[in-house]
Amino acid sequence: MRLISWNVNGLRACLGKGFLDFVALADADVICLQETKMRSQQASFDLPGYHRYWNSADKPGYSGTAVFTRTEPLSVTYDFGEDVHRHEGRIITAEYPDFYLVCCYTPNAQDELKRLAYRMKWEDDLRGYLCQLDLIKPVIYCGDLNVAHQEIDLKNPKTNHFNPGFSDEERGKLTELLGSGFIDTFRALHPDATDAYSWWSYRAASRARNVGWRIDYFIVSERLRDRVRKAEILADVMGSDHCPVLLEIEA
């Protein structure tokens, strides 16, 4: 089974930058999108062979997630936990016979960590949710998690320490998740890979110079470890300030 996750930073814009060509070439069974910034009724493009599910923010043109899947899920849900988490379109859970798929766009802690308190609540509630799902069947959790876990996961860790996405608090929450029976598939297969990033600022030619961060992940239940065949960053794919990430896992 082949899965793609991509923060498209506005799907309508990405459609004009080769999105459908990429989908055709990727030949993925499941495509998870973050930061779609659109509603399902605005999706005028054709995507034959895929069932499409959307979770849009209450605020137009903001946030949003989508899942395109060749196999129709048993069920699809669009929220978790308390009502506070249900207004920004940040999560879709698709249940399949043998696993849960969770597509997520994690809230950014924002400049000066203004939203860190909410981010911490999100992380705690989501970890509890993922652990509950994992008691029932294995979980594939993917998306833009808005955190570089270790120093190896961004170009300039020293100057970014305490910045949003690399604060001790955010990194610690990912450590807690990985200590709860989950693995970072990219690091499981590529423990020492350097200069492997999935997001680059639009400033200062950061992408051309590969001054980036790895903040997009496929995280899976520990018991799926031996079924992971490939976990890659598709850094050559343009269309957003993020690139897609890929997981191939034995069905």
Please identify what each model-predicted range represents.
Residues 81-82, 107-123, 158-162:
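Surface-exposed cleft-lining segments at the edges of enzyme active sites
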Residues 37, 42-109:
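Structured beta-strand-rich core segments of catalytic domains in phosphoester-bond hydrolases
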Residues 1-9, 98-110, 142:
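Active-site-proximal beta-strand elements of phosphoester/diester hydrolases
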